From Swiss-Prot:
Its main location: membrane. One of its GO terms (molecular function) is protease binding. GO terms for cellular component: endoplasmic reticulum membrane; Golgi membrane. It comes from Dictyostelium discoideum. Belongs to the Golgi pH regulator (TC 1.A.38) family. Keywords: Glycoprotein, Membrane, Transmembrane, Transmembrane helix. It is a multi-pass membrane protein. Coiled coil: none annotated. Pfam families: ABA_GPCR (PF12430), GPHR_N (PF12537). Glycans are attached at residues 290, 299. This is Golgi pH regulator homolog.
């Protein structure tokens, strides 16, 4: 093995850039010649590693910021553009939950594409899940309780205390949710990431199955011609006339309310002026009476006058009180009329709201009837029949036979098709790429559908609850929904995609349970939605026939 002495100097050749050595006669020290190559290789590897880590961190941070900005924009410009949410922490909570949720899906796609450093991808995945768990289990519920207690007018210290008590009760109930369900393969301790994610997944999976059961029935219902109701133009015209007539009545009654309030204001101004004049007269009589009593001992000739003067004040007060009672009785009549008119206006506005809804639904029904006569509408009609039967059958078979995720649907379908046509194609390679595309489409569709659903829920209940409470509820449901989506995707995707990033961290979770629970909730949700739509269809038909 070549060695270098301690005085060997490594220098670079100015012309060729090579390495030359200067030997000396000193004793050799046994330093291997490849040590320098190892050092250079280590430094190069460290620099490459540092560059990879820096780019990985930059990608994660920038993507999180972009998701946060998109969530903030969606919050202000779409979801709550007609409502006022003054709490900045509420807006931050929604946007952060939205960004963390989308980052979960982003990391799954990066795992499929083998993008970013693998070790740091694992760390970011664990970091994201930990933040989501803390946010959904502790932060959002506590602030929700804080706003609810604060609305009752308690002091800040009492509000913090009662909110903490409610949070403890909530945590006990939340932890008890997972006891009846086999969410873990083995016990991992009282508090662990798997325990929290597993319980979050139960609630999120329930919400997902309810929405899916509703959508699986309502979408075919929208296209199947059997459920379409005949709509006459005469019916729409009649309802529009009633709507316009009610609008005129509302306008006239509101005009009367404005005139009565103006008249009431004028009378109040006149009453205040009269009160000031009467008060001055009453003070003058009292002052005159007091002066006369003070001069009683000095002027005995005025005793008769002084004895009569005290009677003037009480008599005037009685006359004033009688007049004031009559005046207030006159004022109460316009007030009663205003209250009666406001009640009538509210009834008419409720009637108009119902009429507007009926007109809108009838026009949509007429558009659906026109669409059903087209070639595309007929195709959607048969497609609606197919999916309405297929999804219920698939869920029922999964429950009855306890089917678990094996080969993913894309690989199975591609394998059957290629065997039938006798094509020699790498099924595993192409199924992975097709699965990746379908997973992306499925994720985008799921996010879009969920955002539309929470938009409908907010507009439905925003008048009965505080906007801040609605935002926190939606943020919590959204986070649970996305976590349960990841758990559901674990058994639907090929194992090679999620073997490291999902199974490595959440390996103790019983993923197949969530599919069975989804099917168990999906079927009742679909059946209830079917019965509700049939009942609504018949009731609306009877209503139209009555008109």
């Amino acid at each position: 093995m070549d060695t270098f002495t301690i005085e060997e100097i490594v220098k670079f050749d100015g012309g060729g850039g090579g390495i030359s050595t200067i030997n000396s006669n000193n004793d050799n020290i046994g330093i291997p010649s490849n040590t320098f190559e190892m050092i250079i290789s280590t430094i190069q590897h460290f620099l490459d590693r540092s560059s990879s880590v820096a780019s990985t961190i930059a990608v994660f941070v920038l993507s999180f910021i972009l998701f946060f900005m998109f969530g903030w924009f969606y919050f202000l410009k779409i979801l709550f553009r007609d409502y006022e949410v003054k709490k900045v922490f509420v807006q931050l909570s929604f946007s952060i939950t939205f960004a963390l949720s989308l980052t979960l899906f982003e990391l799954i796609f990066f795992e499929i594409m083998d993008f970013m450093d693998r070790e740091w991808r694992y760390r970011f995945w664990e970091f994201d899940l930990t933040l989501m768990s803390i946010n959904l289990i502790l932060v959002l519920p506590y602030y929700q309780f804080y706003l609810l207690v604060l609305a009752y007018g308690f002091s800040k210290r009492k509000t913090l205390f009662f909110s903490l008590v409610l949070l403890v009760l909530y945590l006990i109930l939340f932890w008890k949710i997972g006891d009846p369900f086999p969410i873990l393969k083995e016990y991992t301790g009282l508090v662990s990431l798997e325990m929290g994610i597993g319980r979050i997944g139960i609630v999120g999976c329930t919400v997902m199955s309810l929405l899916s059961g509703y959508g699986a029935v309502y979408v075919p219902y929208s296209y199947i011609t059997y459920f379409l109701k005949p709509v006459k133009d005469v019916t729409i015209t009649k309802l529009e006339k009633q709507f316009n007539h009610a609008l005129d009545k509302i306008f006239n009654k509101k005009k009367r309310v404005v005139l009565l309030k103006r008249e009431l204001t004028r009378r109040n101004v006149n009453n205040n002026n009269n009160n000031n004049n009467n008060y001055d007269t009453y003070n003058y009589n009292n002052n005159y009476n007091n002066n006369s009593n003070n001069n009683n001992n000095n002027n005995n000739s005025n005793n008769n006058n002084n004895n009569n003067l005290p009677i003037i004040g009480p008599i005037f007060s009685k006359i004033y009180n009688l007049w004031n009672v009559g005046y207030h009785h006159q004022l109460s009549r316009p007030i009663d009329d205003i209250k009666q008119l406001e009640r009538e206006i509210k009834q008419l506005e409720d009637l108009n709201r119902d009429l507007f809804t009926q007109i809108h639904e009838l026009k949509l029904e007429r558009l659906r009837i026109q669409f059903s006569t087209t070639l595309r509408g007929k195709f959607y009609n048969w497609l609606g029949y197919f999916f309405s039967i297929y999804w219920k059958k698939k869920s029922a078979l999964n429950i009855v036979f306890d089917r678990r995720g094996g080969m993913d649907p894309v690989t199975r379908g591609l394998d059957i098709a290629l065997r039938y046509f006798h094509f020699q194609v790498d099924v595993t390679f192409w199924s992975q790429h097709i699965s990746f595309i379908l997973v992306g489409l499925m994720t985008a569709s799921s996010i879009r559908g969920f955002l539309n659903q929470i938009l409908k829920v907010f507009h439905e209940y925003s008048s009965s609850l505080s906007s801040n409470n609605i935002v926190l509820i939606l943020a919590q449901v959204m986070g649970m929904y996305f976590i349960s989506s990841v758990l559901m995707m674990r058994t639907s995707m090929p194992e090679i995609y999620t073997r490291f990033i999902v199974t490595q961290i959440l390996g103790d979770i019983e993923f197949s349970f969530y599919h069975r629970w989804f099917d168990f909730i999906f079927i009742p949700s679909a059946i209830i939605t079917t019965l509700a739509l049939i009942f609504m269809s018949k009731s609306s038909t009877f209503h139209l026939n009555d008109e």
